Structure formats: structure tokens, C-alpha cells
């Protein structure tokens, strides 16, 4: 079998319902391709008749029968499909979400005790195997955990599940073990590509879950690195403290926490950054977009900034990186009619150059502009148009920044207005066609994105190296 595809570059933020501006749970993650690669994406709805009953992986020899009662769910799979499904993020008809996966770190002690399984599951498979069959976030943890125990995994991953009430975060440990923690309601979680959970209570199954033999596994292989053994730190036991982490991972958690808790002074290279924090104020969708677009603004680490040195500007990996494929914010809102409670905000391409677009998820189809991505570059779909804007704007980012900011603000305002209008119509007893509303949102965004591309191309052409100020 060919070498497995690994997308070890994602960034996750989770927002508990008492930490969010509207009482919602929010799960968000950038899906980033490996260095030197770009992965076209599309957003679709998977109906029960389209869900496989016998699943076969492309990346490994894994296969299994699936239940015959799948629910409809949204998905953001690879557009070309040659490497497998890679569904990544979605909401099912029970308004339960799943985001998979955040590739995380491990260590040789763990792998020596429970090696990875070449024939197991990976990021390619997880959403397809779990999301259509779960009716709560907790059920998602338990279903994925059972599959991990039975079949194993060939990579280390973090996975988020949410519903109206709870967010759960699961991290794999070696080939067959796993651990999960419920996100505190008044907190947010920042998780770059490293093992994150830093506190666990074995005697509190309401908020903590794990594979059945995890305590014995820890004791047998001397994995608990704390002195007292009273405060178990899974990150010490199962994670890493590598030089690479200080440049690739910890700075991303630091910059998110710097924005959401500016009163806390921390070191971007610290291995002690908390997995979860209570923000200084409630967190909005716009905040989530901002932190997932971060390139260390207003620090010496910003590759586009005026501060710092040529060395400092390249020392840390940005969150808003060039090779982001798609970003989803899975937004489950309380006290709303069931058919509009779940919103999937979607973006394609590099985050500093794009916008987040909200779609109702209890539908049968997604507009073509977001669902019909193909291999060749085109302005007929949202993915490639965003890629073109980013590539054109990047060399002169500061020149284009105002246009990009205006586009973001105007399109997200339109998104909020659409959500408010539909809710008002339903409360007034009117019938609303959610697919039609999604289409109107798509049409609006398509027009605004084309206008932005026109402006960016015009300005970028006037900034070309071979320009000359005189003409006949």
C-alpha cells in the first residue's frame, strides 16, 4: 500500500455554552494539508441511501459493516476523492456534530506499550464511521472509542463532538487506547497539533471517559509522570515536549489565548499552556474566525507585520497558513426550532483572505458554488475563487487588507441577518424553505467574492514588479 496521507496541520478551538455569546456550543477547526500540498474540498449532504453499509478505507486495509439506520448528515469531503472520503466536519439530523481530526503528538513510551495499527482507522474514516449513528456528543465518544479498541488506529488524533448541551474532546493513545474530557461550559479549548488534555479524573465519568483498561495501562507501563499521582496529567503521560512543538504547536495555543485572555502573560514556547481557559468576555463567531486566521498580528512573529526581524517572522507556524483546505464552525444554538438550531459556517482556503458562510444543515442539498468543486482552477466555485484571492493578495497583504476586512465584515453581517430573518419568519408561523435560504446566501457570497477578486486582481496587477509609471 502507498504511503498514507497525513494532514498533521490543523488547529482546533472549542467554546462551551456559557463562554459563547449566544449560549451555543461551538466546535471549530481548520483542515490543513501537509506542506507542499493543497486539497480541494466541497460541502455536501450525505443522505441515508448514499451512506455505505460496508465501509472500506483507502489509506489502510480497514473495513467494517455499518448499521443499516444512518441519519442524514453534512460533510466536507475531499472534492476529488482519490485518497478516500476525509469527511472532516458535519452535523447530523439529530443536531449532533463531529470534527475529525486534529492530528496530535505522542511519545515512544506510549508507542512501545501500544503500537499504532497499520490496518486501523484514521482521519480519512472517522466521521463516516461515527456521525450518522449518534444522538449526543457523549454517544459519539463511546462509539468512536469502541471502534478504536476493536480495530485500532494508525495515527494519533484528537476528535470533537458536540450537541446543544455539551462538547466532548477525545484523544487517541497509541494504537487502541483513548481518553476524553467534557469541555467545561464556561471555558474554551485551544488545541494545536499536540496532545492537549492536561487534567483527568478517573472517578468522574460525567465529565471524563476513557478506554476500559487505561488505568492499568498507565500503571503497567509507568506512564504517570506526576509525583503525587493525585492530579493525573495526560499531556505529560501521553504527549510530547519536543523542540518542534515550541515552534509548530505551542505558539498557536499561545496566540489564541493571548487574544481571548489578554490579561494572562504567557510564553509562546511554554509546555504549560492550559488546555482550557475561561475567557475574559464571551466568545463570538467572529472571534473564532479571527483566531483561526491568526498570523501573530501585533507581534514580532507576524510574517506580514512591521515588527520583528526576518528571523522572528518565520520562527512560528501561523494558524492562518497558506495550505488550509477548509474551516468549519459547527454552531449549535439553544432555544431554536430544531430545523434551524444547527448552523455550519464554512470557509475554504487560507483563512486571512476568506470569510465564513453560514448554512442551515437540516437540508437535502448544498448550493453548487460550495458543493461542486473540481480539479481545474475556476471562478465557478468558492474553493478555487478563494485560492486565487489568497495567492494574488499575499505578496502585498497590507495593501489589500482593508478590502479583505470589508469583505469579511459585510458577508458575515449578511450571514447573521439571514439567520435572524429566518428565525423571525418561523416564529411568525411562516413556512421557510431552508434550501432556498442557503441558495440565496450562496448567491450573495458568490457575487461579493467575485467583486473582491476583481478588485484584488486589479490592484495586484498595478503592483507588479515590471510596472512603469509613464505611458503613451
Swiss-Prot record:
Catalytic residues (UniProt): 10
Reactions catalysed according to its record: an L-aminoacyl-L-amino acid + H2O = 2 an L-alpha-amino acid
Pfam families: Peptidase_C69
An example Gene Ontology biological process: proteolysis
Swiss-Prot/TrEMBL keywords: Dipeptidase, Hydrolase, Protease
Gene Ontology terms, MF aspect: cysteine-type exopeptidase activity; dipeptidase activity
Assigned EC number: 3.4.13.19
Record bears the keyword Metal-binding: no
UniProt similarity note: Belongs to the peptidase C69 family.
NCBIfam families (UniProt xref): C69_fam_dipept
Protein name: Probable dipeptidase A
Taxonomic lineage from the root: Bacteria, Bacillati, Bacillota, Bacilli, Lactobacillales
Amino acid at each position: 500500500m502507498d504511503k498514507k496521507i497525513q494532514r498533521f496541520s490543523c488547529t482546533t478551538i472549542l467554546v462551551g455554552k456559557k463562554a459563547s455569546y449566544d449560549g451555543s456550543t461551538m466546535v471549530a477547526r481548520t483542515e490543513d494539508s501537509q506542506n507542499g500540498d493543497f486539497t480541494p474540498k466541497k460541502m455536501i449532504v450525505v443522505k441515508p441511501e448514499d451512506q455505505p453499509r460496508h465501509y472500506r478505507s483507502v489509506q489502510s486495509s480497514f473495513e467494517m459493516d455499518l448499521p443499516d439506520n444512518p441519519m442524514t448528515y453534512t460533510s466536507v469531503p475531499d472534492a476529488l476523492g482519490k485518497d478516500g472520503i476525509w469527511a472532516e466536519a458535519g452535523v447530523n439530523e439529530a443536531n449532533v456534530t463531529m470534527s475529525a481530526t486534529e492530528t496530535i503528538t505522542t511519545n515512544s513510551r506510549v508507542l512501545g506499550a501500544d503500537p499504532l495499527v497499520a490496518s486501523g482507522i484514521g482521519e480519512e474514516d472517522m466521521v463516516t464511521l461515527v456521525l450518522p449513528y449518534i444522538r449526543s456528543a457523549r454517544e459519539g465518544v463511546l462509539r468512536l472509542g469502541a471502534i478504536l479498541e476493536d480495530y485500532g488506529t494508525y495515527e494519533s488524533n484528537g476528535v470533537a463532538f458536540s450537541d446543544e448541551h455539551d462538547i466532548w474532546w477525545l484523544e487517541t493513545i497509541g494504537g487502541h487506547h483513548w481518553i476524553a474530557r467534557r469541555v467545561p461550559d464556561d471555558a474554551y479549548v485551544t488545541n494545536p497539533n499536540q496532545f492537549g488534555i492536561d487534567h483527568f479524573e478517573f472517578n468522574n465519568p460525567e465529565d471524563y471517559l476513557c478506554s476500559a483498561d487505561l488505568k492499568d495501562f498507565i500503571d503497567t507501563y509507568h506512564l504517570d509522570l506526576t509525583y503525587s499521582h493525585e492530579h493525573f496529567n495526560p499531556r505529560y503521560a501521553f504527549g510530547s515536549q519536543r523542540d518542534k512543538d515550541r515552534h509548530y504547536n505551542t505558539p498557536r495555543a499561545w496566540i489564541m489565548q493571548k487574544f481571548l485572555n489578554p490579561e494572562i502573560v504567557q510564553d509562546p514556547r511554554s509546555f504549560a499552556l492550559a488546555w482550557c481557559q475561561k475567557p475574559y468576555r464571551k466568545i463570538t463567531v467572529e472571534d473564532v474566525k479571527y483566531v483561526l486566521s491568526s498570523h501573530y498580528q501585533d507581534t514580532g512573529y507576524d510574517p506580514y507585520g512591521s515588527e520583528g526581524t526576518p528571523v522572528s517572522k518565520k520562527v512560528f507556524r501561523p494558524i492562518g497558513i497558506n495550505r488550509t483546505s477548509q474551516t468549519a464552525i459547527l454552531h449549535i444554538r439553544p432555544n431554536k426550532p430544531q430545523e434551524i438550531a444547527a448552523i455550519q459556517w464554512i470557509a475554504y482556503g487560507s483563512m486571512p483572505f476568506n470569510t465564513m458562510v453560514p448554512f442551515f444543515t437540516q437540508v437535502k442539498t448544498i448550493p453548487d458554488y460550495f458543493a461542486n468543486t473540481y480539479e481545474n482552477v475556476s471562478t465557478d466555485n468558492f474553493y478555487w475563487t478563494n485560492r486565487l484571492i489568497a495567492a494574488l493578495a499575499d505578496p502585498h497583504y497590507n495593501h489589500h487588507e482593508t478590502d479583505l476586512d470589508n469583505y469579511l465584515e459585510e458577508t458575515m453581517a449578511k450571514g447573521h441577518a439571514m439567520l435572524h430573518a429566518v428565525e423571525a419568519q418561523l416564529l411568525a408561523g411562516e413556512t421557510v424553505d431552508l434550501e432556498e435560504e442557503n441558495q440565496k446566501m450562496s448567491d450573495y457570497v458568490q457575487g461579493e467574492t467575485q467583486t473582491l477578486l476583481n478588485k484584488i486582481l486589479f490592484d495586484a496587477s498595478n503592483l507588479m514588479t515590471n510596472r512603469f509609471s509613464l505611458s503613451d
